């Protein structure tokens, strides 16, 4: 499996993070990862094909929102919650509040 590059959050402007969350599928992925656990894409059903989900996860990774880690033939993902909260204080808590309100 190829080496996956994760950007430093210091390099990511807030508009890129917000733009990445502009898709209902990507927002659903982030909400699912708010549990703080490591998941693989097959853990969830977002109503899209695997290739489409991979595309959405790539956008989230490039925006610094998720961490992808290869594990054999799987690719595990988790939310970069601590880093996001350090860069954008209160951001994760607001996502949790908004997620609970829906």
Sequence positions of predicted segments:
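Amphipathic alpha-helical dimerization/coiled-coil segments
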Residues: 1-14, 31-35, 80-102
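A broad, low-amplitude sensor of folded, mature protein cores
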Residues: 3, 19, 53, 68-69, ...
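Histidine (H) residue identity feature
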Residues: 6, 15, 39, 55-56
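N-terminal helix-turn-helix DNA-binding core of bacterial DNA-binding proteins
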Residues: 15-49, 71-83
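Generic low-complexity, intrinsically disordered sequence content enriched
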Residues: 22, 31, 37, 57, ...
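Canonical helix-turn-helix DNA-binding module
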Residues: 42-63
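A short, conserved structural fragment
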Residues: 62-71
């Amino acid at each position: 499996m190829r080496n996956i590059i994760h950007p430093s959050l210091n390099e990511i402007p807030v508009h890129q993070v917000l733009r990445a969350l502009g898709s209902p599928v990507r927002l659903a992925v982030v909400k699912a990862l708010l549990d703080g656990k490591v998941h693989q894409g097959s853990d969830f059903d977002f109503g899209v094909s695997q290739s489409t989900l991979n595309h959405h996860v790539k956008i989230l990774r490039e925006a610094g929102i998720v961490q992808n880690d290869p594990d054999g033939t799987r690719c595990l993902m988790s939310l970069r919650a601590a880093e996001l909260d350090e860069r954008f204080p209160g951001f994760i808590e607001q996502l949790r509040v908004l997620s609970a309100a829906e």
